[in-house]
Amino acid sequence: MNSDNNTKKETDERQKRNGSYGRNAGYNTRKQVNRSKNNKYRPQAKQNSRYQEKSAERYPEKNQDRQQKPVLKNSSRNSMNKNTGRNFQKQGRRGRRSSERLKIIPLGGLEQIGMNITAFEYGDSIVVVDCGLSFPEDDMLGIDLVIPDVTYLKDNISKVKGFVITHGHEDHIGALPYVLKDVNVPIYSTKLTLGLITNKLKEHNLVRSTKLKEVKHGQVINLGDFSIEFIKTNHSIQDASALAIYSPAGIVVHTGDFKVDYTPVFGDAIDLQRFAEIGRKGVLALMCDSTNAERPGFTMSERTVGKVFDNLFNEFHSSRIIIATFASNVDRVQQIINTAYRFGRKVAVEGRSMVNVISTASELGYLRIPENTLIEIDQVKDYPDDKVVLITTGSQGESMAALSRMAANIHKKITIKPNDTIIFSSNPIPGNEKAVSKVINELYMKGAKVIFQDAHVSGHACQEEIKLIYSLVRPK
């Protein structure tokens, strides 16, 4: 009997020490402790079943909510996106497995200039952003252009819902005629971009077999598990877009090629307000143009080039002026035409791609050409040198471009004269420096004046503009 009493006393004392008796019930001060960052010990509460039962009797609805409330691993799947009108909750009702993830698959364009193409995949849906080409390196003998490897798209063709194109530059649309032969799905983009794509498809007899869907800025399209919103941006071509890609896994913002230009030559400035609104919703990831990420400050406005042209036309008023630029830079062409008109010069256009772009932009209302300003290349010889401006391709030293053929004396209609002024209104794309230098040397040898500085501004954002977009979007 005495042994039983002693055992009971020892047990009671041990319970007191361990904190599971009397006033200290519910706390274990010896074992259940958390060490915080400042090295202080803090006791952790242990649930008391007696108090829990009383709480359940007094507040049955509160206890029921606590027990039945689900844990959402992906809250965006069960939310309504007000701007897109898309209810992602429907996808959860289809029995979508929690193991599914958003896949971002770059098929080109990373750590290189050109060949931009990225696939976004979720579940049974793939959306492809851009489909560009790049130009061959010096050691790629016999190669005219380089297109991306789309084997992954061909292997998953049943999932591919469409191409979404940010703007109409070759490094974003140039591979479409080749890729569409194996991956023929609809193409979604803005008006001018689709016009330029149509020109390329005509050359390959693919217009009838391709579905082209025009989208306006601010509009949202639904492609499988994705909803994609087009956002107005500025670039060295009009109708450029950024994309807000809504998926059950979250929002991805794809800037496309962009700059922040508050005084664009044509159209509105970049829609920074919309970037901020999307940022407040919560953005999973930001895919940003980084071409000029190593350049500090801001990119200058395209309008500043117009003033440079005015000064150059005034300085070289007595000579024939030939300007080489990118064919797709419609704003640059517009400023050249404006300056030529003010100085009483006629404008001739040379280079197949240049002629196609100017014709398309003019027909769609993106280029305003004063009456009786344009002349044919055959008519150049009928005008004095100080009354003519020639806009040509070849700013990148392409061997078969118009300016390169003029420099090599193999152009059929234009011969370089000692008094000519040649303006390079572009910067060499990395890798093209040698070819451009060769053309410049050949022009100098013929006695022409060559201007290759100060007549160009980039269409890509510098560091401060990238920081601005990042601060607005605030990706996770």
Describe the function of each predicted region.
Residues 90-164, 169-382, 403-415, 434-437:
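His/Asp/Glu-rich metal-coordinating catalytic cores
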Residues 412, 416, 426-447:
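Redox- and metal-dependent alpha/beta enzyme cores, enriched for Fe-S-associated oxidoreductases
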Residues 161, 284, 388, 420, ...:
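Conserved acidic residues
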Residues 299-305, 392-408, 429-435, 455-464:
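A general structural motif
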Residues 283-284, 318, 466-476:
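Proline-aspartate-enriched helix->loop->beta-strand connector
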